[in-house]
Every structure is written in C-alpha cells, then in structure tokens.
C-alpha cells in the first residue's frame, strides 16, 4: 500500500495504523514520480490530508502519470480530507471554500445501504477528527459517497 502525503501532520499516524493491521505500506511525497511508484506492487493508495486548498495556485497535485498508472492497475483509492478533495478536483467534482472552518471531533455516518469494504467492521456511526475549511460541493461522476458528517457548512 502507498500513502501519498500532502503535508498532513497525521500521515505517519495513518501509516502506523495501516501497519498495525499487518499491511505493508510506504509513505511517499504526493509529488512521487511515476517511475518510483511503478516499481512497486501497489495494492491500494491512501491520499492524506494537508494544509492547502486544491484550487489554490501553488497547491500540490499528483501527476497525471500517477493517475494513469493507478487506473491501469485498478488500484483502489481512499482520499482523506485534502486527499478526497484532490480526487474530486482531478476527476471532475467541485471543491470550494466552506462557510467556516471545521476543527475538532465529529461523527461520521455511513450512508444507509453502503456495503463498501473500506468501512467493513466499523459501526454505522463513528468518531473522527477533522480540520479543514473546504467543502465538497459535487462528487465526481462514477464516485460513490460512503459516509458523511453532520457538520456541514
């Protein structure tokens, strides 16, 4: 598994949690080269959070070559915070500033009827930590919303 780091203070914690599940993972910069990732048998990718906004001029973005590589290999993706916004931004969704920043504990609610394997073993509602100022206004075509929080600005 590869974790692409967009500057989150929690990227190492994400990697540790994945390893605690006995899954081998490596932490890479979000600017990793296609050649470096292609040299590994990547089974899944997590895109971390980060302090930027995807629509800012100098925001970090994964290269198109990486997206092509992952699509060719049919690699599942999980975007967390900025990582989710990066996926939406790249694949035709809409990300914009929220009405106000969100910071602190929040409850995630699984979408009723969702049988995504990524949430397998988790309760219908669980606590998470959030820190962001942007909002996903439109999900990209072909993507599926599997959870939400009740704090939406």
Locate each region found by the language model.
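Conserved Rossmann-like nucleotide-cofactor binding loop
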Residues: 9, 33, 85
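Hydrophobic anchor at the start of a short beta-strand
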Residues: 1, 25, 77
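Cysteine-nucleophile active-site neighborhood
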Residues: 16-22, 38-121, 126-127, 133, ...
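Short, charged N-terminal beta->alpha structural module
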Residues: 1-21
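Short beta-strand segments
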Residues: 3, 130-131
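A short, well-structured beta->alpha microelement
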Residues: 22-38
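Cofactor-binding loop segments of dinucleotide-utilizing enzymes, especially the Rossmann-like FAD-
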Residues: 4-6, 30, 82
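Short, Gly/Ser/Thr-enriched beta-strand-loop segments that form substrate-interacting elements
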Residues: 142-150
């Amino acid at each position: 598994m590869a974790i692409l780091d967009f500057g989150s203070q929690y990227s190492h914690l994400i990697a540790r949690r994945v390893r605690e599940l006995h899954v081998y993972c490596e932490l890479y910069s979000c600017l990793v080269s296609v050649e470096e990732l292609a040299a590994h048998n990547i089974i899944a990718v997590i895109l971390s959070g980060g302090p930027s906004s995807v629509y800012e001029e100098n925001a970090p973005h994964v290269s198109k070559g990486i997206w092509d590589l992952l699509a060719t290999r049919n690699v599942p993706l999980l975007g967390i915070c900025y990582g989710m916004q990066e996926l939406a931004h790249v694949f035709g969704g809409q990300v914009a500033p929220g009405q106000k920043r969100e910071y602190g504990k929040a409850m995630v609610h699984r979408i009723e009827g969702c049988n995504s394997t990524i949430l397998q073993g988790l309760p219908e509602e669980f606590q998470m930590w959030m820190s962001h100022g942007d909002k996903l206004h439109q999900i990209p075509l072909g993507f599926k919303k599997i959870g939400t929080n009740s704090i939406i600005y």
